[in-house]
Structures are given as C-alpha cells and as structure tokens.
Amino acid sequence: MRPDPGAQDRRRQGGLHLRIVLEPDFHAVRAALTDALDGLDYLRLSEEERGRLEIVLAEALNNVVEHAAHAGGIELRIAGTGRALRCAVIDDGTPMEGEPPDRTTPPDPFRPGEGGFGCFLIRSLADDVRYVTRAGRNRLSFRIGLGEATLH
C-alpha cells in the first residue's frame, strides 16, 4: 500500500483529498481501510457515518480483490465536498458485467453462487453510485453524505 505523500498537504490547503494505492489482496484492503479512516479522524464523523463509510469502502475494495482477476494495483480516492465525501475505487482488472445491482432489488439469498450482496450494500448505503470502464480501467464512484461534519 502506498499512501499519496501529498494528501496531507492538500488537506491543509483546503478540502480533503486522500489517495491510497494498494495491492489486490485482503490484507492490503484492511490496511487501506485503517489508513483511510485514520485520515478522516479530524472530521469527527459520527459512529453511523464512519460505519457506513467503512462498510461501503470494504465492499468496494473486496469486490475488486474477489472478482477483478489480475487487477494489478487498486487506487482509492476520497475527496471532501461540502457535507459529503466523494469516493472512487479504480482498478485495471476484469470489468464487471452489466450494471451493479439496483438498491431496490435485494439479491435472492437462495440463489446458488454469488449473490450480489456487496453491490446491494454499496447501493443501499451510498448515493450517486456509478460504475464505468474506460480504456481498460474500472471506476466505481459514490458519495457518502455527512450530517454535521462540514468540509472546507
């Protein structure tokens, strides 16, 4: 995992910008989650906001490790905008087929194989969820709304 050395400087200059590059394995995902959440400590997120962010980031990053074979590096970006965090998970692995499942359609728990629960959680807990593949790069982006925390 390689945190962006300039991220702290950009945060001090106005706005929040975190960038973490990690290898596609579950231990690196855990470390990246810790680094990302530690980097947001100064926002004093509520327990609910922090938990929601952690679940969505964990699902997104773990989905890349599980499903995007030969993903190479994974890049996590978090930018603060007003009362929200804009997040992006970028990789060059195997693209997802079709659109992520809609939040209004929960997966069938009795269907064999992958159930799509991770995508359903992401859609349920985040806003403005978008997935695109361009020039061999996959990008999942989403927004996490914040209550009292305001980013300047």
Identify the role of each PLM range:
Residues 111-126:
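Glycine-rich phosphate-binding loop
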Residues 58-59, 63, 124:
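Conserved polar catalytic motif of the HATPase_c/GHKL fold
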Residues 1-20, 24, 123-152:
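Flexible, glycine-/charge-rich segments associated with ATP-binding catalytic modules
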Residues 68-72:
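A short, flexible helix-to-loop-to-beta junction within the catalytic ATP-binding CA
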Residues 73-83:
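Short beta-strand/loop element within the Bergerat-fold HATPase_c
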Residues 34-58, 111-113:
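Conserved short strand/loop->alpha-helix "switch" segment adjacent to the catalytic nucleotide/phosphoryl-transfer site
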Residues 86-114:
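Glycine-rich/acidic phosphate-handling loop/turn and adjacent ATP-lid/helix
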